[in-house]
Amino acid sequence: MNSKKERTRELILNKSYELFAKNGFKQITMKDVCEATGLSRGGLYSHFAGTDQIFETILEVINQKDEMNFEKEMNEGMSAIDILESALHLMEDEMLHPEDSLSLAMYEYAVAIDRDLMNDFNQIGEKKWTDLICYGIKRGEFNEVDVHEIVSVILYVYQGVRMWSRIVDMTDVTFRAITNHIRKQLIKESMRDDS
């Protein structure tokens, strides 16, 4: 069972995530976090020194999530197509819920506080996707693509749609078109469900 300190920290991160997703990074203060969590200022400050530290911790937790960490599945010999399908399903689900996106907050954080941290997270994402695509090519499941090119498309189109969908109505048809394009670029035609 988690200690009271761990549960309080988790409460802070969960409530802060909701605040950042709804309002961006710049508008959120420690007072807002206190109100959302019901903690006193002293209680909150005993866990985090400021909103930037809370936001950085949220990003680290997200980055460590197993859903987009392909290394375990690759080490277990899982099909590259199955790993890709799982990732694309998660991406579609996230695109369908722009209200849960931290894209605006990430942009504001990078401009106001630390662009280098965003670059670090981006490099981690590039490596994860590069490793998966190389794995799929090696296994003969993926086409021989320009890996850097397709990784750039995956990362930047996805993040662009997440940001854009905050201000423009988009449909699931658009989101499926994006993930279907990625499938068609990567998965060998003879191995696709639609062939």
Predicted regions: what they are:
Residues 119, 123, 138-183, 193-195:
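Hydrophobic/aromatic-rich alpha-helical bundle segments in the mid-to-C-terminal region
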Residues 5, 13, 59, 63, ...:
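Amphipathic, non-transmembrane alpha-helical scaffold segments
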Residues 57, 61, 71-98, 150-154, ...:
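Hydrophobic alpha-helical connector segments
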Residues 21, 35, 45-49, 57, ...:
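Base-recognition residues in the alpha-helical recognition helix of bacterial helix-turn-helix
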